[in-house]
Amino acid sequence: TPLYSSAASDVYKRQVNYCTKENIPIFPGAYTPLEIYNANKLGATAVKIFPATQLGPGYVKDVLAPLPNLKLLPTGGVSVDNIASFFKVGAIGVGMGSSLFDKALIANNDYDGLFQHFKKIAKEVFNAKQ
């Protein structure tokens, strides 16, 4: 949910302000550069941008060009195939949902396969940050 949707604007501001005051990490969601900027200005730990695959790594790069100190977390559609591209353009992390936990591996109780899947993701992140 964007930080400044009309109905929830005050609620989000209060949440970010409270968490900042109490030293609680908070990662509000945003879509537009203005929403991202405002979330950061309020004191967000980092800003979750969604949907990452619709916006793409180029969007992250473009937002960070004039505001390189922003901490962005692309979320929504991030997978082992595209995770490195988000780190290479400056994302500090990503949000992974269903692509993190391979449903077929879980359904088959293939814990070694799941472990290998996690290792592959970790390797992609490590290599992208080098």
Cite the ranges covered by each PLM segment.
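C-terminal helical cap(s) of enzyme catalytic domains, especially alpha/beta-barrels
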Residues: 20-21, 87, 104-130
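Catalytic cores of alpha/beta
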Residues: 34-42, 79-94
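Glycine-rich beta-to-alpha transition loops that act as phosphate-gripper elements at the mouths
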Residues: 9-10, 28-33, 52-54, 73-80
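Short beta-strand/loop segments at the ligand-binding rim of alpha/beta enzyme cores
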Residues: 18-27, 66-73
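Glycine/Thr-rich beta-alpha phosphate-binding loop at enzyme active sites
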Residues: 20-25, 32-59, 103-110
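Single conserved hydrophobic/aromatic residue that forms the stacking wall/gate
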Residues: 1-8, 12
